[in-house]
Regions:
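Conserved acidic segment of CheY-like receiver
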Residues: 5-25, 57
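Conserved active-site segment of CheY-like receiver
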Residues: 11-12, 88-93, 113
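Alpha4 helix (beta4-alpha4-beta5 surface) of REC/receiver domains from two-component response regulators
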Residues: 22, 70, 93-110, 114, ...
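Short amphipathic alpha-helix used as the core "switch/output" element in two-component signaling
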Residues: 25-26, 44, 69-82
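Helix N-cap/capping motif at the beta->alpha junctions
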Residues: 35-48, 68
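Active-site beta3 strand of CheY-like receiver
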Residues: 51-58
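Active-site residues of response regulator receiver
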Residues: 59-60, 90
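Receiver (REC) domain active-site loop signature in two-component systems and cognate sites
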Residues: 63-66
Length: 139
């Protein structure tokens, strides 16, 4: 990622979270990774005083407490948060999850790959996209 801002990973599965962290290291992404296990915890981080806003949010959908769709509704309704790009990274095969995610203006919807090499390629494409994308100043 071009920015030095953190990446926020919202993922309840510790194995999947470690896989994302490992993939980011393997492709030499140096942004700090902030990991939260559900939407409520992620909102606490985003609203916390002194916490850097992330350059991107990697979001799972199937989580306890506040799931990914509920989290998206809250983030996209908040003027201070709605411009943060969100990429859904999920094992969900539900068509409605994809429809609802894009209705809430996600930047992308990526399936979690079972094969590690394919997963790293997915993370690499996310990184490349956000490295090449030009955001407005101050974003």
């Amino acid at each position: 990622m071009r920015s030095s801002k953190p990446i926020l990973l919202v993922e309840d599965d510790s194995v999947d979270a470690m896989t994302v962290e490992r993939a980011l290291k393997d492709i030499k992404v140096t942004n700090p990774l902030i990991h939260r296990i559900n939407g409520n915890d992620a909102m606490e981080y985003l609203k916390g005083q002194g916490n850097d806003k992330p350059c991107v949010i990697l979001l799972d959908l199937n989580m306890p407490n506040m799931n990914g769709i509920e989290f998206l509704k809250v983030v996209k309704a908040d003027d201070a948060l709605k411009k943060i790009p969100v990429v859904v990274l999920t094992a969900s095969k539900e068509v409605n999850d994809k429809i609802n995610s894009f209705a809430l203006s996600v930047a992308g919807y990526m399936p979690k790959q079972g094969d590690y090499k394919r997963f790293v390629e997915t993370i690499k494409m996310i990184d490349l996209y956000w490295t090449l994308s030009e955001l407005p100043d101050g974003e």
